[in-house]
């Protein structure tokens, strides 16, 4: 019995890889062998960047909080330390949201810190 080379499992695997490579440039979206390596590499980058995204957003939040705090005469570290001392448990994401979109509330927090300390 001859060897089957056009089986459904084989075709489905190749079709899935080429589907995942859709939108890639040149041969990376057309040829199975290059598409397979491109999809593998894209998966590695996606895995790495899902973790890096968390670090990047935390950095962005800190930058926004620091900028808003410095407009009111406080550094980021003094601002965060004072919040902890006052027992105000807000995460950096929500503080950055206040600093970026609702400056009046953020300024009220700063005034509360200045009155207390």
UniProtKB/Swiss-Prot annotation:
Cross-referenced InterPro entries: Ribosomal_bL20, RIBOSOMAL_L20_CS, Ribosomal_protein_bL20_C
Highest taxon of source: Bacteria
Key words of the record: Ribonucleoprotein, Ribosomal protein, RNA-binding, rRNA-binding
GO molecular function: rRNA binding; structural constituent of ribosome
CDD domains with a match to the protein in the record: Ribosomal_L20 (cd07026)
Any Gene Ontology CC annotation: ribonucleoprotein complex
Gene3D superfamilies tied to this protein: 6.10.160.10, Ribosomal protein L20 (1.10.1900.20)
PROSITE patterns per record: RIBOSOMAL_L20
GO biological process assignments: ribosomal large subunit assembly; translation
HAMAP family linked: Ribosomal_bL20
Function: Binds directly to 23S ribosomal RNA and is necessary for the in vitro assembly process of the 50S ribosomal subunit. It is not involved in the protein synthesizing functions of that subunit.
Family to which the UniProt record says this protein belongs: Belongs to the bacterial ribosomal protein bL20 family.
Protein name in UniProt: Large ribosomal subunit protein bL20
Originating species: Leptospira borgpetersenii serovar Hardjo-bovis (strain JB197)
Taxonomic placement: Bacteria, Pseudomonadati, Spirochaetota, Spirochaetia, Leptospirales
Gene symbol of the encoding locus: rplT
